[in-house]
A protein has these predicted regions:
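Basic nucleic-acid-binding alpha-helical/helix-turn surface characteristic of O6-alkylguanine DNA
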Residues: 1-114, 160-169
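Gly/Ser/Thr-rich beta-alpha loop segments that engage phosphate groups in nucleotides
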Residues: 14, 95, 122, 126, ...
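Mobile beta-alpha loop/short-helix "lid" or hinge segments that flank ligand
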Residues: 23, 128-130
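Regulatory, non-catalytic segments
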Residues: 110-128
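Short Lys/Arg-enriched helix C-cap and helix-to-coil transition segments
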Residues: 130-137
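…primarily DNA-binding HTH/wHTH and HhH modules…
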Residues: 140-169
Length: 169
């Protein structure tokens, strides 16, 4: 069974999607990949994963880095999963470039070249926004590049993290 619930962030509402075992999606309502079937859903706060996700968001949007993980149900290609794994390791308040991710993947693949565009495509297919922090991936020279929720939200998320980032976060 699939469960849906809405959560209001300071930057716009998101839809939280999960099943009995894991979180499977977080989308801003303005996202270009917003799942159409989630348009008219009612809250289902009885689902433990939704409750934990909302707690995670409460902590995050209060300016702190949540200190617990959520069970993630990630679906995608092997390449996408590798990219999302690297993204998940980007520390709170920090950013990396598409090129840095491509270089890391290349090193993991015995030096086989990985294009920044392929990385960008995989980043764009992330279904669990904010929690898999694709907003922390930027273009060369600090340029703000695509974000499914919109560049404005990406900038706000990064600003929130930078304003509240400490070595202990």
């Amino acid at each position: 069974m699939t469960y849906y619930s809405k959560y209001s962030t300071p930057f716009g509402d998101v839809i939280i999607i999960c099943n009995e075992k894991s979180l499977t999606g977080v989308y801003f309502y303005s996202s270009r990949y917003f799942p159409v079937e989630a348009n008219n859903v009612s809250a289902n706060d009885k689902c433990e994963i939704i409750a934990k996700t909302k707690k995670w968001f409460d902590i995050y949007f209060s300016g702190k880095c949540p200190d617990f993980d959520l069970p993630l149900g990630i679906s995608g290609t092997d390449f996408q999963k590798k990219v999302w794994c690297i993204i998940s390791q980007i520390p709170y308040g920090k950013t990396v470039t598409y090129g840095e991710i491509a270089a890391r993947l290349s090193a993991q693949n015995g030096g086989k070249k990985v294009s920044c565009q392929a990385v960008g495509h995989a980043v764009g297919k992330n279904k669990i926004s904010i929690i898999i922090p694709c907003h922390r991936v930027i273009g060369a020279n600090g340029e703000m590049k695509g974000y499914a929720g919109g560049i404005e939200k990406k900038i706000k998320l990064l600003s929130l993290e930078k304003e509240n980032s400490t070595e202990d976060n």
